[in-house]
Amino acid sequence: MPETAEFELTTQLAEFLRTHHFGKYRGLVTDVGDPEAIGRIKARVPAILGDELETPWAMPALPFAGPQHGLFLLPEVDDGVWIEFEGGDVSRPIWSGCWWARGQVPSPAGEKQRLLATSAGHQILIDEDADEIRVTHPGGGEFVIGASEITLKLGACELKITASEINLNNGMVKVTAAGASLVNDAFKIGA
């Protein structure tokens, strides 16, 4: 009798493992238009579903989330994502991160640089080597915060702020504790 129970248990375990999938699988995003707007995506996972079928809405696995706070970043259609299945159940997918193919890593990408880059070209770069935070707009605007200087650029205009002065367009306008000067000292207010 015990042999029958062991055989039955082994059969049940084999069936469970045949119908459940554990671990991470490469996927490609097919849809990000989540009707519930909670960060879900759909993806093709060829290793599990073949090349044509997509997952049901996959829940995100996020570093933090709560009522009206958290990190909300979605991949785009055709981006590579890692897909897992809750309890191994294919009907309950989770997207747990993204991956780049060779040549897809955005620049700059260094060991001490933390970059958030959108496909439209917007960037937030935290650069520990340069000791600065840089926000860049694809239209040319740039905002740089350094330890001793803050710079705002747009086209030919540049505003620099330091602990001792505010400088607009390389001295066209300067404001210091002593006063202000306009057009390279042609007009002064103060001492």
Describe each region flagged by the PLM:
Residues 2-164:
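Hydrophobic packing positions characteristic
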